[in-house]
């Protein structure tokens, strides 16, 4: 929404209704890339943004009013690539300001169960869109224990479009919101080579066809040039990681409207010898040397106008190197790659929602959208570290974190 459109949306209102919440004195960054607008009030009703108005209008009073005193109000953050698997991790993500997350990969369907607990109101967390697995030639023990009908792949690889389509149908039937395919090998294991392709064009095309029938998108784990190029031609929604993308693939992504989720922030902890991965020397060295080419790719993608979304690739859990990564770290990484702070915040809000296909519901501050909101105490355009310190987090109109001084 443009600045002009935001101001046009300002309206007067009546008395405070039951179950309503007012946020007054807000400096609103609406997530669209427009400059902040000071002196606004937001009315929330039935979990949605019902009204945005000028502070000059009669101020509401009552228990359902939070006076922000000029603090900065943004859309809740979108983590476009996470590995949230437990209710505790989901709660940590939410309290960090993440109100929507796409979980790509799932061990023993734990993320799927956590998603269902959150949706049923039994656990606190962001809205989770879950892949319920990783479709690749070697499906792995966690996948096969969750889908024992594919036990024949315990000792042999998945191969061919028909086999891939069968697996994708099963994952969708289990309730997946998105399909994750392996276009290249993993980077996070010392014994794999992220430059080596995995699924073929025909296999990924079959995955896209099955997902499309179900109204779902496909995300491609892709570090390698060849694998990423095949994934884009196959019609995936997004390329994840993209460390070694070449110019041809980037141009193709721009032409096809393929989104890019580079997961920049995860590189630092995985390459940090002080972390839990310190014993895997090969992994440390690899991760450290992947940072430079990935940053170069991100700069090229930005210059081409490819839509880039922020993410963590993290677990928000306990006991692993990825747990401490936050979306705010990725905002800092994007700024280091030439984004303005406003562009980086847009990548963490509206553009993340676009990647997930939920931009009609969340990702911006606009009348009619879900009240997924984040408040910080200082201007994040001048100091992006403000995003590490949320003062207020609201999801679906409910306050889940409140550090506002009264």
Protein language model features and the residues they cover:
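Histidine-centered divalent metal-coordination motifs
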Residues: 25, 71, 77-85, 221, ...
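Divalent-metal coordination cores built from histidine and acidic residues
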Residues: 67-74, 90-216, 249-251, 256-269, ...
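C-terminal cap of metal-dependent C-N hydrolases
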Residues: 348-350, 367-406
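Histidine-rich, glycine-flanked metal-binding segment
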Residues: 19-21, 28, 32-74
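Active-site core of metal-dependent hydrolases
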Residues: 104, 183-295, 309, 314-318, ...
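His/Asp/Glu-enriched, well-ordered alpha-helical/loop segment
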Residues: 213, 292-379
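Bacterial N-terminal signal peptides
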Residues: 4-15
């Amino acid at each position: 929404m443009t600045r002009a459109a935001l101001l046009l949306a300002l309206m007067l209102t009546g008395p405070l209704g039951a179950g309503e919440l007012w946020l007054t004195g807000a400096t609103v960054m609406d997530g669209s890339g427009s400059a902040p607008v000071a002196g606004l009030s937001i009315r929330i009703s039935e979990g949605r943004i019902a009204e945005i108005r000028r502070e000059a209008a009669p101020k509401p009073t009552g228990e359902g009013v939070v006076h922000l005193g000029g603090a900065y109000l943004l859309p809740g953050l979108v983590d476009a690539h996470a590995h949230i698997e437990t209710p505790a991790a989901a709660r940590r993500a939410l309290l960090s300001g993440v109100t929507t997350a796409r979980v790509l990969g799932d061990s023993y369907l734990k993320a799927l169960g956590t998603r269902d607990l959150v949706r049923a109101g039994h656990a606190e967390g962001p809205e989770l869109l879950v892949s319920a697995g990783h479709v690749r030639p070697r499906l792995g023990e966690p996948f096969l224990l969750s889908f024992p009908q594919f036990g024949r792949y315990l000792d042999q690889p998945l191969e061919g479009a028909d086999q891939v389509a069968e697996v994708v149908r099963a994952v969708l039937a289990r309730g997946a919101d998105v399909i994750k395919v392996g276009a290249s090998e993993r980077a996070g294991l010392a014994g794999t080579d992220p430059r080596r392709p995995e699924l073929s064009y025909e296999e990924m095309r079959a995955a896209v066809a099955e997902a499309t029938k179900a109204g779902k998108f496909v995300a491609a784990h892709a570090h390698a040039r060849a694998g990423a190029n095949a994934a884009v031609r196959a019609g995936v929604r997004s390329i994840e990681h993209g460390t070694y993308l070449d110019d041809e693939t980037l141009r193709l992504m721009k032409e096809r409207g393929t989104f890019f989720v580079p997961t920049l922030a995860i590189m630092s902890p995985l390459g940090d010898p002080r972390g839990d991965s310190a014993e895997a020397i090969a992994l440390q060295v690899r991760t450290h040397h992947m940072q430079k080419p990935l940053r170069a790719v991100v700069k090229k993608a930005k210059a081409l106008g490819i839509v880039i979304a922020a993410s963590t690739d993290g677990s928000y859990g306990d006991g692993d190197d990825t747990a401490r990564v936050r979306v705010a770290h990725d905002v800092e990484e994007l700024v280091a790659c030439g984004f303005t702070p406003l562009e980086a915040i847009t990548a963490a809000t509206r553009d993340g929602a676009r990647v997930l296909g939920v931009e009609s519901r969340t990702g911006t501050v606009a009348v009619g959208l879900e009240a997924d909101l984040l408040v910080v105490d200082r201007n994040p355009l001048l100091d992006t570290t403000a995003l590490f310190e949320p003062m207020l987090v609201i999801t679906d109109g409910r306050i889940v974190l409140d550090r506002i001084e009264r």
